[in-house]
Regions:
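Extended, small-residue-rich solenoid/repeat segments and analogous flexible loops
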Residues: 1-67
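Glycine-rich hexapeptide-repeat left-handed beta-helix
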Residues: 2-27, 72-135
Length: 135
C-alpha cells in the first residue's frame, strides 16, 4: 500500500503537503476543506485555505487556488483554473481550460464556457446558455 500524501516544494523553498482525496484521488493541500462527497479527480489540485462543498466536482487537471470557495454541486471542468479568493456559486459550471480570476465571483447556476476568462474581481451571472447577463 503506497503513501496517501505527496510533498511538493514551491519556488520559494516552502514545502506543501497534499493528501489524496478519498473520492477521486485528487490532491488536497493541508489547510483546505473539501467535503467527503465532493469529487476531486486525480491530477486536480486544491490549495491551502480553499473550500469545496458537498457534491461539487473538480475534474482532472483543474487547479483551485488558496482561499477560493466552490459551492455545492458546482462543476469545475478539466484544466480549469480558479484564482485566489474566487467564489464559484452553487450549481455553477466552469468550462474546460476556463479561468476565473483572483477574487472573482461566479453566480449561482452560471455557466462559464470552455476557454473563457473571468477577470480578476469580476462578478459574472449568465443565462442557461452561458450568455453573460448585464450587471
Amino acid at each position: 500500500m503506497g503513501k496517501n500524501y505527496v510533498d511538493i516544494e514551491r519556488d520559494n523553498g516552502e514545502t506543501l503537503r497534499y493528501r489524496k482525496h478519498v473520492n477521486g484521488r485528487g490532491l488536497i493541500a493541508h489547510g483546505a476543506k473539501v467535503h467527503a462527497s465532493a469529487l476531486i479527480e486525480a491530477g486536480a489540485y486544491v490549495e491551502p485555505g480553499a473550500q469545496v462543498a458537498a457534491g461539487a466536482r473538480v475534474l482532472r487537471g483543474a487547479w483551485i487556488e488558496s482561499n477560493a470557495a466552490i459551492g455545492p454541486e458546482a462543476v469545475i471542468e478539466e484544466h480549469a483554473h480558479i484564482g485566489e479568493g474566487a467564489v464559484v456559486g452553487s450549481g455553477a459550471r466552469i468550462g474546460v481550460r476556463a479561468t476565473v480570476g483572483d477574487r472573482a465571483r461566479v453566480a449561482v447556476g452560471a455557466k462559464i464556457r470552455d476557454d473563457e476568462i473571468v477577470g480578476d474581481g469580476q462578478i459574472v451571472a449568465t443565462d442557461k446558455r452561458g450568455l453573460r447577463l448585464a450587471a
